[in-house]
Regions:
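Sec-dependent signal peptide hydrophobic core
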Residues: 13-17
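Coiled-coil-like amphipathic alpha-helices with heptad-repeat character
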Residues: 1-2, 142
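Generic structural signal for individual residues within well-ordered alpha-helical segments
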Residues: 7-10, 120
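C-terminal segment of N-terminal export signals and the immediately downstream linker at the start
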Residues: 3-8, 20-59
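Mature-region segments of soluble proteins
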Residues: 41, 52-59, 63, 72-191
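General helical structural elements
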Residues: 10-11, 151
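Residue-level marker of structural boundaries
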Residues: 18-19, 128
Length: 191
């Protein structure tokens, strides 16, 4: 597959996610594979986000789902941002908004510099649409995206599969119909 074709494929995946459709596991597998290739020589180097933005995303990921950073959720998101400008705008703008709000509210340089209770208080404000206001709407929109993408990135990774006990499609050496439902169906049959 040529690099241009791969890029078009990844951009199509990102565009589908922006339209609100769920990410099929096969497409997520392609993204995780591409991230693994990028990580092959050591630690993942962000492709779309700045070092600060990526560190903030890692921190947010860990708050949303502990263990998601090690499972590659931030790299999954960054990779999609690298092929989709709209998604990149959501994350760079959202992280910038979050840092700015933390500065106004707590006089810190950014989200990662705040104390855990300050971070939790801020996320509690933007976690629920019932708190919608002109001031909080950008954060609510961003955090909604961040949560969904962290969940997608984590639960389509090997660690996420392991957590839920997903083994993939398994071949059966022998198949038999369970007798209890079969007997129940036969008893109800009028013939």
């Amino acid at each position: 597959m040529s690099e241009q074709t791969r890029r078009e494929m990844f951009c199509g995946i990102a565009a589908a996610m922006l339209s609100g459709t769920l990410l099929p596991a096969q497409q997520a597998e392609h993204i995780h594979h591409a991230v693994a290739e990028a990580r092959a020589n050591g630690k993942y180097a962000p492709k779309a986000l700045t070092t600060h933005e990526y560190a903030t995303l890692e921190h947010l990921s860990e708050i949303i789902i502990p263990g998601s950073a090690a499972a590659g959720a931030p790299a999954f998101i960054d990779f999609l941002c690298s092929v989709c400008d709209d998604m990149k705008d959501i994350f760079t703008g959202g992280i910038g908004w979050l840092d700015e709000q933390m500065g106004h509210r707590y006089q810190v340089a950014g989200f990662v510099d705040a104390r855990p209770e300050q971070q939790t208080a801020m996320l509690d404000l933007i976690a629920y649409r019932k708190n919608a206001s002109p001031e909080l709407n950008p954060g609510i929109h961003f955090f909604d995206w961040a949560r969904r993408m962290v969940v997608d990135g984590y639960y389509t990774s090997a660690a996420g599969f392991k957590e839920v006990g997903y083994m993939g499609n398994q071949g059966l050496s022998h198949f038999s119909v369970p007798q209890e439902p079969l007997q129940y169906a036969l008893k109800r049959c009028p013939v």
